[in-house]
């Protein structure tokens, strides 16, 4: 009898690798649910009896937002409804069958709104000029109308942590403002509450989750406007910092939640003109002649690298 020897090492290695991937994916899911849940609680985004209109574009962010919200709804201590909405703007090449098929298979209530805003923008905006302003206004108006028609009490958008930081830098670099994307706001028509449940979520986690879930991603056919080019450049800057300087992006995002108006220059946010010496010592008062100190410097070598980078 001939003996056949089988090397079991590759099989064992594959099994170990599979278990590792499964564990990492489980950790990722827990982190996404935790961060979305924390944002919802911190900003009171969703309340008892809400009907949340989840805007789904076909990109990884909106797919992930819908996915995580459905998971959270299943175990939430309150009741709320979800309806997924896609605005088909009739851009050339948009695969209109993808989202209805996916949402039907998912079993979620959904609505596809067909509006040819693409032709309107092309007709009104001269060739070579930016289309962002008009396109955005048209899209907003349509989605707010649909929210009214569906009886939605909240409109959920899929902007994440990196989008908020990109917007902060775009406003600072090109508009001279310290302004980002709020996690929750009242719409410009005064009738709707808009929420961003992914406010605490890093884009790199959404990329991994989309790969794991195999969402049917619809390629984004951007118009190539200057604003989008600038956003891409700022996004690459943030990714480069994230690669080279551990903790920098997290610290910047934390800074958006720790604003000190008295140490900026906006007189509408702090009464500099009315300041008077009271003669009473303040332990938290500014030490004007001292060099600012950063607690992080004494706590972590990585922070020192962040500041020096």
From Swiss-Prot:
Residue sites binding [4Fe-4S] cluster per the record: 132, 135, 223
GO MF, any single term: ATP binding
Primary localization: cytoplasm
Cofactor(s) this protein requires: Mg(2+); [4Fe-4S] cluster
BP GO annotations: tRNA thio-modification
Short motif (PP-loop motif): ranges: 57-62
Pfam families, per database record: ATP_bind_3
Cofactor stoichiometry and binding remark: Binds 1 [4Fe-4S] cluster per subunit. The cluster is chelated by three Cys residues, the fourth Fe has a free coordination site that may bind a sulfur atom transferred from the persulfide of IscS.
Location of the protein in the cell: Cytoplasm
Gene Ontology cellular component terms for the protein in this record: cytoplasm
Pathway: tRNA modification
InterPro entries for this protein: Rossmann-like_a/b/a_fold, TilS/TtcA_N, tRNA_Cyd_32_2_STrfase, tRNA_thiolation_TtcA_Ctu1
Record keywords: 4Fe-4S, ATP-binding, Cytoplasm, Iron, Iron-sulfur, Magnesium, Metal-binding, Nucleotide-binding, RNA-binding, Transferase, tRNA processing, tRNA-binding
Reaction(s) catalysed (UniProt annotation): cytidine(32) in tRNA + S-sulfanyl-L-cysteinyl-[cysteine desulfurase] + AH2 + ATP = 2-thiocytidine(32) in tRNA + L-cysteinyl-[cysteine desulfurase] + A + AMP + diphosphate + H(+)
Enzyme Commission number(s) of this protein: 2.8.1.-
The protein's enzyme class: transferase
Disulfide links within the chain: none
Record's keyword annotation contains Transit peptide: no
Similarity comment: Belongs to the TtcA family.
Subunit (UniProt): Homodimer.
Described purpose of this protein according to its UniProt entry: Catalyzes the ATP-dependent 2-thiolation of cytidine in position 32 of tRNA, to form 2-thiocytidine (s(2)C32). The sulfur atoms are provided by the cysteine/cysteine desulfurase (IscS) system.
Protein name: tRNA-cytidine(32) 2-sulfurtransferase
Organism whose genome encodes this protein: Variovorax paradoxus (strain S110)
């Amino acid at each position: 009898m001939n003996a056949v020897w089988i090397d079991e090492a590759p099989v064992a290695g594959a099994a170990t690798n599979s278990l590792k991937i499964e564990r990492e994916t489980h950790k990722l899911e827990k982190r996404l649910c935790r961060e979305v849940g924390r944002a919802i609680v911190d900003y009171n985004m969703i309340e008892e009896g809400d009907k949340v209109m989840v805007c789904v574009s076909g990109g990884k962010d909106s797919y992930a937002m819908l996915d995580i919200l459905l998971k959270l709804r299943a175990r939430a201590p309150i009741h709320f409804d979800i309806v997924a909405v896609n605005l088909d703007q009739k851009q050339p090449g948009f695969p209109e069958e993808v989202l209805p098929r996916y949402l039907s298979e998912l079993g979620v209530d959904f609505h596809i709104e067909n509006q040819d805003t693409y032709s309107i923008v092309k007709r009104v905006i001269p060739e070579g000029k930016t289309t962002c302003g008009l396109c955005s206004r048209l899209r907003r108006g349509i989605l707010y109308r649909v929210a009214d028609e569906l009886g939605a009490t909240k409109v959920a958008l899929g902007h994440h942590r990196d989008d908020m930081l990109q917007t902060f830098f775009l406003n600072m670099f090109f508009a001279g403002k310290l302004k980002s994307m709020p996690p929750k706001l009242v719409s410009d028509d005064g009738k709707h509450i808009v929420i961003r449940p992914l406010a605490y979520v890093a884009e790199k986690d959404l990329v991994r989750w989309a790969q794991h879930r195999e969402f049917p991603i619809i390629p984004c056919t951007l118009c190539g406007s200057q604003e989008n080019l600038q956003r891409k450049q700022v996004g690459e800057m943030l990714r480069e910092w994230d690669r080279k300087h551990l903790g920098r992006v997290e610290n910047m995002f934390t800074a958006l939640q720790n604003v000190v108006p008295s140490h900026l220059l906006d007189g509408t946010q702090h009464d500099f003109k009315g300041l008077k010496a009271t003669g009473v010592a303040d332990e938290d008062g500014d030490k004007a002649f001292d060099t600012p100190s950063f607690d992080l410097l004494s706590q972590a070598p990585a922070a020192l690298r962040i500041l020096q980078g």
